[in-house]
Amino acid sequence: QKTIPYRTLEYLDWKTPDWIVYPGGALGNTSSCGKCLMELYQWGWIKKIPRIAVINAEGANTLDVLYNGKFEDTELRWNNGNFDVELIERYYTKMNDDGIRPKTKATAIQIGKPSNLVKGLRALEYTNGIVISVTDKEMLDGMSVVGLNGFDCEMASGAVPAGIKKLLNDNIIKKD
């Protein structure tokens, strides 16, 4: 998974984009991208660290809930490795007690307890990243955008154009 950003940046002659956007499920791609960016920056191969945006499905948005303080009004952060493990445990307990299960048609990101949550937090901290959620309808619209260009993608990948659209509309990602 670390190869994806590596090869992309190599293709771009090590000129980094402002943003790298991933759908958020288990957060393996997010954490691998963060690790790749750390290494490339340490080696001096890239001069600027792009920001990572993680796009959760609204029905499977554990990272969005925890990262953006939607549970107990506390924003979960990597905090140089001193993340609040008790906050994660309390949220997972609430999920279990309340019968909260991930629900989205985007099955590739239909994950309630991301296995790479902590590593994802590290990547977000390192890149000054952000997390948002999009609806299933927005992901379907994102798939349509990809389709208009002659490509096909599954629903979770449709989260990326949907998230970019939302971030552009919110003026978080700037139009160039």
Locate each region found by the language model.
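Active-site/ligand-binding-proximal alpha/beta "capping" segment
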Residues: 1-43, 140-146
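Active-site/ligand-binding loops adjacent to catalytic centers
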Residues: 39-155
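Helix N-cap/coil-helix junction residues
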Residues: 14, 45, 151, 172-173
